[in-house]
Amino acid sequence: MTSGNNINQPVTYPIFTVRWLAVHTLGVPTVFFLGAIAAMQFIHR
């Protein structure tokens, strides 16, 4: 039980990383604005 402590804490990348935060803080508004602009193309006054 001395070196078996590392099994529950893998060295692989976790889900919530700084890269995940950066991708989603940039990507979610980008997709939202792209969808809004694309929807505005079909609105004719």
From Swiss-Prot:
One of its GO terms (cellular component) is photosystem II reaction center. Belongs to the PsbE/PsbF family. GO terms for molecular function: electron transfer activity; heme binding; iron ion binding. It comes from Nostoc punctiforme (strain ATCC 29133 / PCC 73102). This is Cytochrome b559 subunit beta. Its main location: membrane. It holds the Pfam family Cytochrom_B559. Keywords: Electron transport, Heme, Iron, Membrane, Metal-binding, Photosynthesis, Photosystem II, Thylakoid, Transmembrane, Transmembrane helix, Transport. Its cofactor is heme b. The chain crosses the membrane at residues 20-36. Heterodimer of an alpha subunit and a beta subunit. PSII is composed of 1 copy each of membrane proteins PsbA, PsbB, PsbC, PsbD, PsbE, PsbF, PsbH, PsbI, PsbJ, PsbK, PsbL, PsbM, PsbT, PsbX, PsbY, PsbZ, Psb30/Ycf12, peripheral proteins PsbO, CyanoQ (PsbQ), PsbU, PsbV and a large number of cofactors. It forms dimeric complexes. With its partner (PsbE) binds heme. PSII binds additional chlorophylls, carotenoids and specific lipids. The keyword Nucleotide-binding does not apply. It is a single-pass membrane protein. InterPro entries: PSII_cyt_b559_bsu, PSII_cyt_b559_CS, PSII_cyt_b559_N. GO terms for biological process: photosynthetic electron transport chain. Heme binds at residue 24. The keyword Phosphoprotein does not apply. It comes from the Bacteria. This b-type cytochrome is tightly associated with the reaction center of photosystem II (PSII). PSII is a light-driven water:plastoquinone oxidoreductase that uses light energy to abstract electrons from H(2)O, generating O(2) and a proton gradient subsequently used for ATP formation. It consists of a core antenna complex that captures photons, and an electron transfer chain that converts photonic excitation into a charge separation. It is found in: Cellular thylakoid membrane.
